[in-house]
Regions:
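Hydrophobic helical membrane-anchoring modules
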Residues: 2-42, 57, 188-190, 214-272
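A conserved acidic beta->alpha catalytic loop
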Residues: 75-84, 103, 135
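Short beta-strand/loop segment that forms part of the nucleotide-sugar
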Residues: 46, 69-78, 99-101
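Short, acidic, metal-binding catalytic loop of nucleotide-sugar glycosyltransferases
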Residues: 60-70
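Acceptor/aglycone-binding surface of glycosyltransferases and processive sugar-polymer synthases
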Residues: 99-120, 127, 139-220, 247-257, ...
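Active-site beta-to-alpha loop of glycosyltransferases that engages the nucleotide-sugar donor
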Residues: 46-60, 77
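Acidic helix N-cap motif at the loop->helix transition within catalytic regions
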Residues: 53-57, 80-89
């Protein structure tokens, strides 16, 4: 397998239309490792940075679900060799794509990059699932997300705060901060859901195509921006309960600057 260097293309250096230009798609397709002609009903986006302790187990469990899916790993040039683990997984599973970004660039850009890549494929999936790559999200919840999506919901959120949802191994402080953030966001965005910051979701590809040009977040505020854009379009949004388990291996990626970006985004919405 030929190993690609980190992609030199800045996918965020220009405004992109909902339908990516053929020249732009051709450029970054050269940076993707794997079979770009893969056909799948479901695309799974896994943003990674230093996840060698988790990525093999996670991908193996996703594959064991037996769903018609493909997996897109977007690695921010992890110094621990996460991309090499992904390459070894590609030898076992032909439905895995790897996109190596030149540096740590934030969750928001990873998700929008993943959206753009799936939209640009010859055979785009019908649903796109996002989830954390640190095993905080249980891959066994994916079928329930897909089932709800197939009932006609354009965005399905795995909620920690709806009935039967929950968290494990969280400190009281972390739980309080999360709930306050969700309350403030609810007052600002006003979608009829309980969990705005959950990263485990299923989007219809049609919804992603409609809103991709309006997604500009660089970090964790992408979770709110996508719900806001879906709500502005009067999309059908549903929640299913999930249990979020605090990561057992590796370190949390959330930084003070990303918290500041999150707060700034909420304030910017409130001023509009």
């Amino acid at each position: 397998m030929q190993i690609q260097a980190p992609c030199p293309i800045d996918m965020h250096s220009r405004e992109q239309q909902p339908q990516l230009s053929m020249s732009f798609a051709s450029d970054f397709h050269q940076c993707i490792e794997g079979d770009l002609a893969v056909k799948s009903q479901i695309g799974v986006i896994l943003p990674t940075y230093c996840e060698t302790a988790n990525i093999e187990k996670l991908v193996t469990e996703i594959e064991s679900l037996g769903l018609p899916l493909s997996i897109l790993i977007l690695d921010d040039s992890s110094p621990d060799g996460t991309a090499n683990v992904a390459r070894s997984l590609q030898k076992k599973h032909k439905n895995i794509l790897l996109f190596t970004r030149p540096k740590k660039s934030g969750l928001g850009t990873a998700i929008t990059d993943g959206f753009k890549i799936f939209l640009s494929l010859e055979f785009p999936p019908e649903q796109i699932v996002t989830m954390d790559a640190d095993y905080s999200h249980n891959p066994k919840e994916i079928p329930r997300l897909i089932e709800a999506s197939q009932e006609g919901y354009e965005l399905v959120v795995g909620s920690r705060y709806c009935q039967d949802g929950g968290t494990q191994d969280w400190s009281i402080m972390r739980l309080a901060i999360s709930k306050i953030a969700n309350l403030v966001t609810k007052l600002t965005v006003n979608a009829q859901i309980s969990d705005y910051t959950s990263g485990m979701r299923c989007y219809s590809t049609d919804l992603v195509r409609k809103m991709i040009k309006d997604l500009h977040s660089h970090t964790y505020e992408i979770q709110i921006e996508t719900i806001r854009q879906a709500n502005l379009r009067k999309s059908k949004i549903e929640e299913i309960p999930i249990t979020f388990v605090n990561r057992k291996k590796g370190r949390s990626k959330l930084s003070i600057n990303e918290i500041k970006d999150f707060v700034s985004y909420i304030l910017s919405i409130h001023r509009r």
